Curated annotation (Swiss-Prot):
Required for normal embryo development. Necessary to acquire heat stress (HS) memory, by modulating nucleosome occupancy and regulating heat-induced gene expression. Associates globally with the nucleosome-poor regions flanking the transcription units of expressed genes. Binds to the promoter regions, primarily to the proximal promoter just upstream of the transcriptional start sites (TSS) and somewhat more weakly to the region downstream of the transcription termination site (TTS), of actively expressed genes (e.g. HSA32, HSP18.2 and HSP22.0) in a heat-dependent fashion. The gene is FGT1. A zinc finger (PHD-type) spans 691-741. InterPro entries: P-loop_NTPase, SBNO_Helicase_C_dom, SNO, SNO_AAA, Zinc_finger_PHD-type_CS, Znf_FYVE_PHD, Znf_PHD, Znf_PHD-finger. PANTHER family: PROTEIN FORGETTER 1 (PTHR12706:SF13), STRAWBERRY NOTCH-RELATED (PTHR12706). Residues 1-14, 75-89, 162-177 have a biased composition (Pro residues). This is Protein FORGETTER 1.
């Protein structure tokens, strides 16, 4: 909106009169449209710039009459636009600290529209394009009808006269309509989109019927099950053999067919296409690989490379090959072979499987020969055999996050694929890539590169990041549709999950508090000790890195130890009910134990305390000590002095130095001998005239009699020195001045060294005291040794870990002894396999597994094993990453088992410990999304996503919390344990929270101010810490449990608020959502909109008709059913809205849900609402109907009207495209192959008017008549034409 500016007239001559409150009568007050400060504007000033924020603006219409002067304006002076006000007028505008008027007027912001509020009539500055907002004055929700506004503006412009220099007037726009609250609520729910449905479906190969059924129930995520793989065309050579032996199940044979079929294809760059086996742990990937090797062997491809994570797994490889009948195929472990040519006479491997680990892939000999070169040479450039990456997540960090380097293994995996381009690549892993960036090494899938939508991996990654979790889910579906991916998982049916909270016992809590206190004091001690060091800075960062990593490990140990009593109790309970126990942990504490054994010997009084040894090691090696000085002997003193002398003023000539320093007694008292050392030093290059030359010295005959000082190297006349020298000395002579200085220097040096020694000894004493305190602290023993001991010792407990030795209690019960884990009969390499066998044979009923010792180990209740007791799997320590969590869960849950395990996930009631669960939950979320097509997948049991704090919302919550604690912003929630009626409780909490954050090094440079701000706290949190949830949760561990839990609760409360708000705004990414309706019908035959050239897979556009309504009869029977079952409450029934909208009221059915006090809402047009409503909100917005007849009429009327129009009424600006509250609607879904057309759809959606329509949304929809399920991208009705046009263009290019 533009208006011609007005030249302000000269100020009125009349004297202003003061008004009440100090406001000058005739002036007007206006609130700045930018910074909202109240300004006083002189009479006649219509346009002005705010002196505070410099925003140019105008007076609003209601103040124009008061601002306009009462005399005519001179027509001769043309108006000039005002950029900034002239100084006199600038001075007339002063911010006022006055009480706000009841309805303060706002300045007009020329960049926005000015519209009156429908309720209080205040003129509002409304940004262009904003259609819904609340009035800041009276808080009524308002909506703008854009079409009416445009008509109004057009009309006002067509009737306007040529511009005159008169004061500007604002054309009156139509008042905004009051918002239909019910329409907004329904719209929000539609934007959020449906509910998260069931995650898994039972699995059977859809297009193959060869082979026996799998021995255990297998499931697939419902997203993936909605996608059909391509038609199988490959004919297996070993088909008849497999049908006879029944060695492979139907789903393992399906993998063989699709993998071999995929290996017949080539990517656009000429390399052979690869296949990804993403089956979950325990489905039988090993036997599937053996089947592939046997099939290729039959085709004459007799060389294969099998890369896995541990050399122990070669025994499993041998077993699997024997099971499928490939007994003649040799398995050659590479780690036992020399670096020479594998097919040479010495080594003699002409064919068979070379089995190696990922670490071998990057190994090289002393002579520089690498295993990678050796393998490539053995295969040859034309190699077209199998290259198997088993457990391929080991290569995951090829494309690392910012600031880190790609791993050598990741690089080697890509290199070997480049060097043998025709190899038949199999990627095989239950965890695949837990994040899309970890797919970087899967170059043979053809998802990026030549002939795809993404030129390189980074473009592919970028698209997925933008698409959110739904995009990850689509990648898995896409790969299945193109025949390059299978992903089935063992059903967790029968497996029981429970999260067990191990609350800190009283003794443990006291120990924890004492430890937190000690670490805080140690930090202060280290800070003050570092301050005495002269070169403190370089060592400082290293010291603090070690401090915080030790801090984290220490409290992690403590958390584990806190769970030992519960673990032992649960284990004994399981054993007493005829079950057996598997305990999973990550760290064994071996390093601490070995250090203690090296220090104290093989026999100890008790088990080693890991936390104590960790603290001792940190303090002993890192306490900042000043350098110990070396004492000076007499000889050293002289040498030191000479060194000092010779190093001084190297630029001065000896002759000059002699003359300057050989001072003698002057002849008269008129000459002053008070020359400062500084002066003499500065004059070294001046002329020699200023020196007094001794007449005797200058004589030729006397030159031979000069004395030479051995210290200062100067020459003196014997008679000129004080006192004079009569007999010339035969040995070294020192002048009086040097003799005096030498003694003085040595004395000072000795004092200095004594002071340094004193300081060093004081620091040493402090260090010794700290070590004494550490030794006196009551700290727990190593959890692993403790559990083994409490459950009966090594005779009863099978240990599968990576450690070499362990502490065992002596037979008399006194003291413990360190002994090797293996005996004479068993090598260290075989000890874990031996222990596993003892467990599977039932000779030991408790197994303890660590990540290092259990990779690939099967501990399920196997039908072939002696020990078929039900497994109780206790996770004492959740792994750092979900990759490892899945591997750990899969040890006890595998195919061919008599019973599924019971899982017990142990957490302490410490807020900070959830850090470890947070990482696992984050990984599980994206892991399920990518490798199993559905982000709620994880293992189909525990909901660990409740603990996912390390998300974007988590980072934002952390920042909000920090700012609130530092009192930079107001906290959006009341801190835990505080009362709104007692503000001092909040103040007290904030003080404690700041002190806690100082103690753990998050708040830096903290000081308490003096002077007028006495007691005021100052400190800062650096930007990188503001969003670092990991650091917050790690450091939180080091606080006493009380403040730790209060801080954590505050953080999660803020997170809940932010997530709730995001849901309301429709910006929360909830992955795949189900579209629910009473009737879902496919409207017409799906259109094929794109076909992939290589696989023949197509992209289809499906159009569905949904009827979401609930008839009066259905609603009545719902209510009747509740009452009949005795589940109803007095407040259940039919309600009508208190407010009318377009002359109509809305009707709902409300009944109390299981969550007491909250009501489920059913609407005639859209059925049951996702959001439940509180009783108070229900009574505020609706009134209960006593007349059923009135309820019926209103319900049926709304049911009928909503079939043809949306809730906004017949004049809705989106017209037929609007679906808000429309009972019958069309839904368009693009299904099938999505990845190749991703960019096209993204571009088309970006042009949509409604914000929620711009977002890529993945939905799942199922027809009610024939249960046809489609998963794909939702295309808003308004965008269908654009998408189809763009897709036709894409298809032409592809053709």
């Amino acid at each position: 909106m533009t208006q011609s500016p007005v030249q302000p007239p000269p100020p009125l001559p009349a004297q202003p009169h003061s008004a009440a409150g100090g406001v000058i009568r005739g002036d007007v007050q206006v609130r700045c449209a930018g910074c909202r400060v109240i300004l006083r504007v002189k009479t006649g000033v219509v346009e002005f710039s705010c002196p505070t924020c410099q925003l140019p603006q105008m007076l609003p219409p209601e103040l124009l009459s008061r601002a306009r002067p009462q005399f005519p304006q001179s027509p001769q002076q043309p108006p000039q636009p005002i950029q900034t006000l002239p100084p006199p007028i600038q001075q007339q505008l002063k911010p006022l600290n006055l009480p706000r008027p009841p309805v303060p007027a706002h300045g007009i912001d020329p960049t926005k529209m000015q519209l009156p509020c429908a309720n209080c009539q205040a003129i509002l500055n409304v940004p262009h394009g904003l259609t819904r907002f609340s009035c800041p004055q009276c808080h009524v929700e308002l909506a703008v009808d854009v079409s009416k506004l445009n008509r109004s503006l057009t009309a006002s412009q067509s009737h306007s006269n040529p511009p005159t220099p008169a004061a500007p007037t604002v054309p009156p726009p139509p008042p905004p309509e009051e918002v239909n609250e019910e329409a907004i609520e329904v719209e929000r729910e539609e934007d959020e989109g449906g509910t998260a449905g069931e995650t898994f479906m039972d699995y059977r190969p859809p297009k193959l019927s060869i082979g026996p059924p799998h021995p255990d129930p297998i499931v697939e995520t419902s997203s993936l099950s909605a996608v059909q793989p391509p038609e199988p065309t490959y004919d297996l050579k070993i088909k008849e053999e497999l049908e006879r032996s029944k060695a492979l199940s139907c789903l393992q044979i399906e993998t063989l067919v699709y993998a071999c079929q995929r290996h017949l294809q080539h990517l656009a760059d000429g390399t052979r296409a690869g296949f990804f086996v993403g089956d979950g742990a325990g489905v039988g990937k090993g036997r599937t690989i053996a089947g592939l090797i046997w099939e290729n062997w039959k085709h004459g491809r007799r060389k294969a490379l099998w890369i896995s994570i541990g050399s122990d797994l070669k025994y499993d490889a041998r077993r699997d090959l024997d099971d499928v009948g490939a007994t003649c195929v040799g398995v050659n472990p590479l780690n036992k072979l020399p670096y020479s040519k594998l097919d040479s006479k010495n080594v003699g491997i002409k064919e068979g499987v070379v089995f190696l680990t990922y670490n071998s892939l990057i190994a090289s000999s002393e002579k520089g020969r690498s295993r990678l070169q050796q393998l490539v040479q053995w295969c040859g450039p034309e190699f077209d055999g199998l290259l198997i990456f088993d457990e391929c997540h080991k290569a995951k960090n090829l494309v690392p996050e910012a600031g880190s380097q790609p791993t050598r293994i990741g690089q080697a995996v890509v290199d070997i694929q480049d060097k043998i381009p025709q190899a038949r690549v199999i990627y095989c892993s239950a965890t695949g890539a837990s994040e899309p960036r970890n797919m970087g090494y899967m170059v043979r899938l053809g998802l990026w590169g030549a002939g795809t939508s993404f030129s390189d991996f980074n473009k592919f990654l970028g698209a997925l990041d933008k698409g959110g979790t739904g995009a990850l889910e689509l990648v898995a579906m896409d790969m299945k549709a193109r025949g390059m991916y299978v992903c089935r998982t063992l059903s967790y049916k029968g497996a029981e999950f429970e999260i067990v909270e191990a609350r800190l016992e009283a003794g443990m809590e006291a120990m924890y508090n004492k430890s937190a206190e000690f670490w805080a004091e140690l930090r202060i001690e280290l800070l003050s000790a570092s301050a005495f060091l002269p070169n403190e800075k370089p060592n400082s960062s290293q010291l603090w890195r070690l401090y915080w990593s030790s801090h984290q490990r220490f409290f992690r140990h403590l958390c584990m130890s806190a769970k030992v009593p519960v673990t032992v109790r649960l284990a004994k309970k399981a054993l007493s009910t005829n079950k057996c126990v598997v305990i999973g942990l990550q760290s064994t504490g071996e390093a601490r134990t070995e250090e203690a054994v090296n220090k104290y010997g093989l026999e100890l009084d008790d088990f080693v305390s890991g936390p104590r040894e960790l603290l001792l090691k940190f303090v002993e090696e890192n306490y900042p000590l000043p350098e110990q000085p070396e004492p000076l002997s007499e000889d050293d003193s002289v040498k030191e002095l000479q060194r000092k002398r010779h190093s001084a003023s190297p630029g001065v000539s000896i002759r000059g130095r002699v003359r300057k320093m050989a001072k003698w007694k002057p002849d008269s008292d008129n000459e002053s001998d008070l020359e400062s050392e500084a002066d003499s030093a500065d004059d070294s290059n001046d002329s020699d005239d200023e020196f007094q030359i001794c007449q005797i010295c200058s004589g030729e005959d006397e030159r031979k009699k000069l004395l030479h000082c051995s210290e200062c190297d100067k020459l003196f006349h014997p008679d000129c020195v004080v006192p004079p020298v009569i007999d010339l000395p035969s040995e070294a002579w020192i002048c009086f001045s040097c003799k005096e200085k030498t003694e003085e220097y040595i004395q000072a040096r000795r004092l200095y060294i004594a002071e340094l020694q004193k300081r060093y000894e004081a620091a040493l004493e402090r260090k010794s005291k700290i070590i004494e305190i550490i030794r006196s602290l009551n700290l727990p023993n190593n959890p692993l040794d403790d559990i083994v001991d409490q459950l009966g010792g090594p005779e009863k407990v099978a240990e599968m870990t990576g450690r070499r030795g362990m502490l065992v209690r002596a037979s008399n019960g006194k003291g413990v002894t360190y002994q090797a884990r293996n005996t004479k009969d068993i090598t260290m390499e075989m000890v874990n396999m031996h222990e596993k066998q003892l467990f599977m044979d039932g000779k030991k009923l408790v197994a303890i597994i660590s990540e290092a010792g259990s990779a690939g180990v099967s501990l399920q209740a196997d039908r072939r094993a002696v020990n078929q007791k039900r497994r109780v799997h206790l996770t004492l320590e959740l792994p750092w990453s979900a990759d490892r969590a899945i591997q750990q869960f899969g040890r006890t849950h595998r195919s061919n088992q008599t019973s599924a395990p019971e899982y017990r996930l142990l957490f302490t009631n410490l807020g900070g410990e959830r850090r470890f669960a947070s990482i696992v939950a984050k990984r599980l979320e994206t892991l399920g999304a990518l490798t199993q097509g559905d982000r709620r997948a994880g293992p189909s049991g525990p909901s660990l996503s409740a603990y996912n704090y390390d998300s974007n919302f988590g980072k934002k919550s952390l920042m909000v919390m920090y700012r609130g604690i530092m009192e930079q912003e107001k906290l959006p929630v009341l801190p835990p344990g505080c009362s709104i009626d007692e503000p001092e409780t909040v103040k007290e909490f904030l003080t404690k929270a700041r002190a806690a954050l100082v103690a753990v090094g998050i708040v830096r440079d903290s000081v308490l101010a003096n002077g007028k701000d006495v007691g005021r706290f100052s400190g800062r949190i650096i930007d990188s810490d503001m969003h670092d949830v990991g650091r917050f949760l790690n450091r939180l561990l080091g606080l006493p449990p009380d403040i730790q839990n209060r801080l954590f609760e505050l953080f999660t409360s803020i997170l809940d608020v932010l997530v709730h708000n995001a849901r309301i705004e429709g910006s929360f990414d909830s992955g795949i959502v189900d579209m629910k309706a009473n009737s879902v019908e496919l409207l017409s035959t799906p259109k094929t909109v794109h076909v992939d050239q290589m696989s023949g897979a197509s992209t289809m556009l499906f159009t569905f008709t949904l009827d979401r309504g609930v008839t009066w009869e259905s609603a009545s029977s719902m209510l009747e059913g509740k009452r009949r079952d005795g589940l109803g409450s007095a407040n259940d029934g039919f309600f009508e809205s208190k407010r009318e909208w377009l002359g109509r009221r809305h009707f709902i059915l409300a009944f109390e849900s299981a969550a007491s006090g909250l009501f489920k809402i059913v609407r005639p047009a859209v059925g049951e609402s996702i959001r439940e409503m509180s009783l108070s909100e229900l009574k505020t917005k609706y009134r209960k109907l006593s007349s059923l007849e009135k309820a019926r009429t209103g319900w049926e009327d709304e049911y009928e009207v909503s079939s043809k129009q949306c809730m906004h009424g017949p004049k809705c600006k989106l017209g037929e495209y609007c679906t808000v509250g429309r009972r019958i609607q069309e839904v368009n879904v693009v299904g099938g192959l999505i990845l190749p057309i991703w960019g096209t759809i993204e571009k088309a959606l970006s042009k949509q008017a409604r914000h929620s329509h711009k977002r890529i949304r993945v939905i799942r929809i199922e027809t009610t008549t024939d249960n046809q399920r489609i998963v794909g991208l939702s295309i808003p009705n308004a965008a269908v034409e654009t998408v189809l046009q763009d897709l036709a263009w894409v298809q032409e290019i592809d053709d």
